[in-house]
UniProtKB/Swiss-Prot annotation:
Active site, UniProt feature: H10, E88
Class in the EC hierarchy, top level: isomerase
Gene3D superfamilies found in the cross-reference section: Phosphoglycerate mutase-like
Name under which the protein is recorded: 2,3-bisphosphoglycerate-dependent phosphoglycerate mutase
Catalytic activity as recorded in UniProt: (2R)-2-phosphoglycerate = (2R)-3-phosphoglycerate
Enzyme Commission designation: 5.4.2.11
Family matches, as NCBIfam families: pgm_1 (TIGR01258), PRK01295.1 (NF002339)
Record carries keyword Ribonucleoprotein: no
Ligand binding (substrate): 9-16, 22-23, 61, 88-91, 99, 115-116, 159-160
Functional summary from the UniProt entry: Catalyzes the interconversion of 2-phosphoglycerate and 3-phosphoglycerate.
Domain of life of the organism encoding this protein: Bacteria
Pathway(s) per entry: Carbohydrate degradation; glycolysis; pyruvate from D-glyceraldehyde 3-phosphate: step 3/5
PANTHER family documented for this protein: PHOSPHOGLYCERATE MUTASE (PTHR11931)
Length: 212
């Protein structure tokens, strides 16, 4: 039985390009972000991948990435379930601020702690621990059972909601997760064992040009 789980962070958004804290704000994808999503779909198709169901967040950048991936794979219209449990972490008072401006206001060390620590939230926002507290129950109760039943599952979401999942899948600690970056538009392909642990993991090489 194939137990396939593919995680994909959305393509570059307009606020990624401007280096703004985004969180639950809802900017569109850039042209590069659209290209990243399409490229991910082409790569997955080239690997012979097909999906039975897709999950995404309530935010457009993830929803559009999901749709573009599926379109490139010839699976437009696939069952796609949206849920705010998969939303990006809420950056609270940092939302909409330029990251360099935030460093000038609060200092490099404080902003780094808010961005990379496991359990220190920015003012009015969520820590990675808080994000995991909504992502992981949704994964365990809703997504994982479908993977374990043999369905091939795509999850198109966000850097921090996916970091929470990767932390569990890869057995990372609250310290090692601090250094993990999930690139935009790069699929993480997991195959799971019968006990729900990881059998294999494949990551698209971001330097591969799928048009050549």
């Amino acid at each position: 039985m194939e137990r396939l789980l593919v995680l994909a962070r959305h393509g570059q958004s307009e606020w990624n390009l401007k280096k703004l804290f985004t969180g639950w704000r809802d900017p569109e994808l850039t042209e590069l972000g659209i290209d990243e999503a399409r490229r991910a779909g082409r790569w997955l198709k080239s690997q012979g991948t097909q999906f039975d169901v897709a999950f995404t967040s309530n935010l457009r950048r993830a929803q559009n990435t999901c749709a573009l991936i599926l379109e490139e794979m010839g699976q437009a219209g696939l069952e796609t379930i949206r849920n705010e449990a998969l939303n990006e972490r809420d950056y609270g008072d940092l939302s909409g601020l330029n990251k360099d401006d935030a460093r000038e206001r609060w200092g490099d060390a404080q902003v780094h702690e808010w961005r990379r620590s496991y359990d220190v939230p920015p003012p009015g926002g969520e820590s990675l621990k808080d994000t995991a507290a909504r992502v992981l129950p949704y994964y365990i109760q809703t997504i994982l059972p479908r993977v374990m039943s043999g369905e091939r599952v795509l999850v198109a979401a966000h850097g921090n909601s996916l970091r929470a999942l990767v932390m569990v899948l890869d057995g990372m600690t609250t310290k090692t997760i601090a250094s993990l970056e999930i690139a935009t538009g790069i699929p993480l392909v997991y195959r799971l064992k019968a006990d729900t642990t990881v059998e294999s993991k494949t990551v698209l090489d971001k330097d591969i040009d799928q048009d050549n």
